[in-house]
């Protein structure tokens, strides 16, 4: 059976790019895997054209923020519930929190994944994880070394661990 893997890094453009080598590493380790990435709306375009990502799941933060500002709490609750239901339908085998914050940890927990791993979990997000990998295990002299360290800890191939951002043919022209 193919692995269904969810990566969660909701925001921070640079960190999303720094974490991008993990997608290829997971694909090399699990060639039949389905890779999904949960990301906040403003950053979805960074991942949308990556051919190795099967699905970019967009956290509808703008809609939820508008409903909250308009004090439409029941509509907000319905939207959040529908989103969680849709997320769980994927039946993820593995969810990895690349952000380590409570907001990303909650989504990893709500994903219903049978295995949940957090990178440097803090703010209480470790309570949603089965395993936490120390963010400081990487080489501090190398920027974003925590993602390389995470890959090594998960037994992923790291021989080619280079950052990549896929762009649409229109954007490349």
Where are these regions (language model features)?
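Catalytic machinery of carbohydrate-active enzymes
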Residues: 1-173
């Amino acid at each position: 059976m193919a692995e269904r893997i969810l990566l969660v890094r909701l925001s921070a453009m640079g960190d999303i790019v720094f974490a991008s080598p993990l997608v290829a590493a997971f694909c090399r380790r699990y060639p039949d895997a389905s890779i999904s990435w949960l990301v906040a709306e403003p950053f979805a375009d960074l991942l949308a054209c990556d051919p190795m990502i099967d699905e970019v799941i967009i956290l509808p933060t703008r809609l939820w923020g508008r409903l909250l500002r308009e004090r439409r709490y029941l509509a907000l609750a319905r939207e959040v519930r529908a989103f969680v239901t849709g997320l769980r339908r994927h039946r993820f085998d593995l969810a990895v929190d690349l952000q380590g914050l409570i907001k990303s940890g909650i989504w990893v927990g709500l994903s219903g994944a049978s295995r949940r791993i957090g990178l440097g979990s803090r703010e209480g997000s470790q309570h949603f994880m089965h395993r936490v990998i120390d963010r400081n295990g990487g080489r501090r002299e190398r920027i974003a070394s925590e993602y390389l360290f995470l890959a090594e800890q998960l037994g992923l191939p790291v021989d080619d661990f280079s950052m990549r951002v896929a762009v649409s043919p229109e954007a490349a022209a």
